[in-house]
Swiss-Prot record:
Gene: coq7
Alphabetized Pfam families for the sequence: COQ7
Enzyme Commission numbers on file: 1.14.99.60
Name of the protein this chain belongs to: 3-demethoxyubiquinol 3-hydroxylase
Gene3D superfamilies tied to this protein: 1.20.1260.10
Catalyses which reaction(s): a 5-methoxy-2-methyl-3-(all-trans-polyprenyl)benzene-1,4-diol + AH2 + O2 = a 3-demethylubiquinol + A + H2O
Cofactor note: Binds 2 iron ions per subunit.
Length: 208
């Protein structure tokens, strides 16, 4: 696919993400799970966590699109696009769960998307190995915060738990795939910067 075609594909993806019309390619893992009895505080907490997870998937779409756009290797570009497609499943699942909880996505999604796309572009310009290293570190941090959510979500919120469990499994697989393609380890200082930015995003998106 030529660069102009990839650019058009990116704009199409961005519009779908921003408009909330993403469609999952796989069944929702919570589709056949009974909804638990949540009180108002538990419902608000679950919604806050799932909003954070939805923002994470908005950022994932931007990151993978940017990195795929500027990847040098066709094989690496295809892997990034494949991972991005699976992340779009997560986007659809978390959006659906937010609706079920009577809540909404983050009001700052355009800002999160733009920032993540810029970050992905910078990572891609450093070369494929470093870009893949960025994927590995991103997925490691995302998997860690998803596992924290598994402990923080109300035990009776079986639907959210089912979604987060599948997301965690997928993130680990994406990180392993990037590592197998020759990822270069992200320097410790960059890892700390990524963690700091993620903390700002998660603490803000929980409410907004």
């Amino acid at each position: 696919m030529q660069f102009p075609d990839r650019l058009i594909q990116h704009f199409d993806s961005a519009l779908r993400v921003m408009s909330g019309v993403s469609v999952a390619g796989r069944p929702n893992p919570a589709a056949k799970v009974a909804d638990g009895d949540l009180d108002s505080a538990q419902r608000r907490h679950s919604a806050g966590l799932m909003r954070v997870n939805h923002v994470g998937e908005v950022c994932a779409q931007a990151l993978y699109q940017a990195q795929a756009q500027f990847a040098r290797s066709p094989a690496i570009r295809q892997q990034l696009l494949l991972a991005g497609r699976e992340e779009e499943d997560h986007l659809a699942w978390t959006a659906e769960r937010l609706r079920e909880l009577g809540s909404r996505p983050s009001l700052l999604n355009p800002l999160w998307y733009a920032g993540a796309f810029a970050l992905g572009t910078v990572a891609a310009t450093l070369g494929d190995a470093r870009s893949l290293g960025f994927v590995v570190e991103t997925e490691r941090q995302v998997e860690a915060h998803l596992n924290q959510h598994l402990s923080s979500l109300p035990p009776q919120d079986a639907k959210s738990l089912a979604i987060v469990k599948q997301m965690s499994t997928d993130e680990a697989e994406h990180g392993a795939a990037a590592h197998a393609l020759g990822a270069q380890t992200v320097p410790p200082l960059a890892q700390m910067g990524m963690q700091a930015m993620a903390k700002v995003m998660t603490s803000t998106a929980y409410y907004l």
